[in-house]
């Protein structure tokens, strides 16, 4: 079974943990409890293929920056999350993306831009078109709006990253084990 290392990044309070826990455990976490770093594993089926996802839920961008290079280096796919209710969280993502590309030393990194908390439409300050435009600027990066609370597009975030990783590095046929027979 193929393993995928996915990393969820963004400013504090955008709902990174809420999205991750909703995806992995099917629970909405109401209380805000700042994360240092949590790792989750979940087996899923994407396009008929069994996958083991290892999801790293990270601290907000303003905290624990020293750890960031390491998980950017090891991550295969990245969800860059902002809150549609806070413009500053959207603005923070450009630097984060540039850091990922610098650490990975390539422009071709599986990535999805996520506008979270879309259930709070009456508190929206970041328009959907702003997210779409930024995703286009980022080499046609995938874009979704989501809500961990209302379970909108939660699974799609992680499945999309798996599909991007599969397109970038497809699994070839399983290498056959070479067996040798020795007669003594």
Swiss-Prot record:
Q: Name one Pfam family in it.
A: Ras
Which positions does the motif Effector region occupy? 32-40
- Location of this chain's protein in the cell: Cell membrane; Cytoplasm, Cytosol; Cell junction
Which Gene Ontology terms of cellular component type are present?
Answer: cell-cell junction; cytosol; plasma membrane
Q: Molecular function terms in GO for this entry?
A: G protein activity; GDP binding; GTP binding; GTPase activity; MAP kinase kinase activity
One GO process term, biological-process aspect: negative regulation of synaptic vesicle exocytosis
Kindly list the positions at which Cysteine methyl ester occurs in this protein: 181
Query: Which residues are the lipid attachment points (S-geranylgeranyl cysteine)?
Result: 181
EC number(s) stated in the UniProt entry for this protein: 3.6.5.2
The record's annotation in PANTHER family points to: RAS, DI-RAS, AND RHEB FAMILY MEMBERS OF SMALL GTPASE SUPERFAMILY (PTHR24070)
**Classification via CDD domains:** Rap1
**Its domain of life?**
Eukaryota
Which taxonomic lineage is given here? Eukaryota, Metazoa, Chordata, Craniata, Vertebrata
Name of the encoding gene: rap1b
Q: Could you say which protein family the record assigns here?
A: Belongs to the small GTPase superfamily. Ras family.
Name the record gives this protein: Ras-related protein Rap-1b
InterPro entries per UniProt: P-loop_NTPase (IPR027417), Rap1 (IPR038851), Small_GTP-bd (IPR005225), Small_GTPase (IPR001806), Small_GTPase_Ras-type (IPR020849)
Q: Which residues form the propeptide?
A: 182-184
Function per UniProt: Probable GTP-binding protein that possesses GTPase activity. May play a role in endothelial cell polarity and endothelial barrier function.
Q: Which UniProt keywords apply?
A: Cell junction, Cell membrane, Cytoplasm, GTP-binding, Hydrolase, Lipoprotein, Membrane, Methylation, Nucleotide-binding, Prenylation
């Amino acid at each position: 079974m193929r393993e995928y290392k996915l990393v969820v990044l963004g400013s504090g309070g955008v709902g990174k943990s809420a999205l991750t826990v909703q995806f992995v455990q099917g629970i909405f976490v109401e209380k805000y409890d700042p994360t240092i770093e949590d790792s989750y594993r979940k087996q899923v089926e994407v396009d008929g293929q069994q996958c083991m996802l290892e999801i790293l839920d990270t601290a907000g961008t303003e905290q624990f920056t020293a750890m960031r290079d390491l998980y950017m280096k090891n991550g295969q796919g990245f969800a860059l999350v902002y809150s549609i209710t806070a413009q500053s969280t959207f603005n923070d993502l450009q630097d984060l993306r540039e850091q990922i590309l610098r650490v990975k030393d390539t422009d071709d990194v599986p990535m999805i831009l996520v506008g979270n908390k879309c259930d709070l439409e009456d508190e929206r300050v970041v328009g959907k078109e702003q997210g779409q435009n930024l995703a286009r600027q980022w080499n046609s990066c995938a874009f979704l709006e989501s809500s961990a609370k209302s379970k909108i597009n939660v699974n799609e975030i992680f499945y999309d990253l798996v599909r991007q990783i599969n397109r970038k590095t497809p699994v070839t046929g399983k290498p056959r084990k070479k067996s040798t027979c020795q007669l003594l």
